[in-house]
């Protein structure tokens, strides 16, 4: 193929050099080689395209062959059908020719019909199953709705029951609270009722005792009308009367073994009863008028009545407005329960007024009546026995004793043969516990010990120093009070030591017997030294605190009477004595706990006339 370049396209001639020829041939060779490569590439592409076309044509050919075959089969079938139809329509010798084709057609038709019937049956069965399942599903849904409705009803009923249950619980709690409050109120009412019954019974017994004492006093006043002559100052003292040394004053207690009735009668014979209070007070006035140096007292006949709160009117206490010391004046020479003295607290010296001077002048105007008759002693013993019978009959009417242990009181007054009734006891009730006790106080003058009683729940000792000139109580030692006054005319009066009527408190019942706690004891309820004006007559001037303490003391008397039901208990020996500071030789009260569980205080001191141990008369604890 000629080149576009003229120099190269021109074939070199023989005159041209070999290099030119060689270059021309090389260019020709390269050109032909490039054309060959292009041709080969184009031929390869063409070959690939042709192969693709061949494959596509072959595929089309196969499809067409299949179509041809199917069409041939259809043609054959149509031919058979056509022949069959023609055979049916035309009877002739041609039927024999189409018999094989007819058999094949029937066979295929039978197969088709059987398959169609089977499919129709399956369809019918499936439809029935579907309908049945739909019905079941509907029934299940209905049942599910019923269950849901029932569950809702059950839930609502449970909620209602829970609400009702909560309401019932709240109501039950409220009812329990109301029942508890009702029980507490009923218990309070029962306690109040029992307390009122006890107070009523106490008041009845106290009234009976006071009436009996009043009758005894009237009888003794009617019997003792002849006064005895006063003792002159030069008359020597009776050694038994003024022998009040600590050796002769023996502490007795209800815990010691009670002597027989014979011993009590002997003690009553040895200690004759004192004259009536009115006569002894008149003799005391006379003796005091005869002694100008003796301290004056507030005294009257009504002072010594059984409800008197003041036996020593000259010893007033300006600071004591609520006295609680119980004091009953008896009709014989029995030591009177008086206010106990505390040696540590001095009291202001009272100023005698015109009333005290007047009463003391009246006290000096009469003498002591005669006392010592065996007839009077026997009469007193008979009255004492009657009173004991009345106390026993009153005990049978009392309710049973409480469960809490109570403290008994010492009854040292009944050994002297005058009144069988023991000292009144001031009891403090703490809740349901009824606590009672007795206190002992001893007044010492010139080394002598004089027993006196104060109805407290703890014992204490009041000391009398050398200058203390308090005379003996008109109700306790009325037989020799004027003698002691006339024998000691030069005794200077001094202030009375601090007694239990000071503002001190006491532990209730059996909580403490420590002497350090005895100074906190409150006063008794009835005995009040007249610290405000004039003479206290009977129980007319008892204030509210004293009324309350009086009721407590009356209830304590019931406790004391109940304690008499217990068997007698002997006291163990070898007990230590407790002596307060500043006092020597005075028997101190001792606290003993017996096997019955009752805490008792012994501080009873025997009368100065006797040297032997003195215990209660006919009373066992």
From Swiss-Prot:
Coiled coil start-end: 18-219
Organism of derivation: Aspergillus fumigatus (strain ATCC MYA-4609 / CBS 101355 / FGSC A1100 / Af293)
Subunit structure comment from the entry: Self-associates. Interacts with nudF.
Protein name: Nuclear distribution protein nudE homolog 1
Lineage, top ranks: Eukaryota, Fungi, Dikarya, Ascomycota, Pezizomycotina
Record InterPro entries: NUDE (IPR033494), NUDE_dom (IPR006964)
GO biological process terms, semicolon-separated: centrosome localization; chromosome segregation; establishment of chromosome localization; establishment of mitotic spindle orientation; microtubule nucleation; vesicle transport along microtubule
Gene name for this UniProt entry: nde1
GO CC field: cytoplasm; kinesin complex; kinetochore; microtubule
Stated role: Required for nuclear migration within hyphae during vegetative growth.
Presence of keyword Protease: no
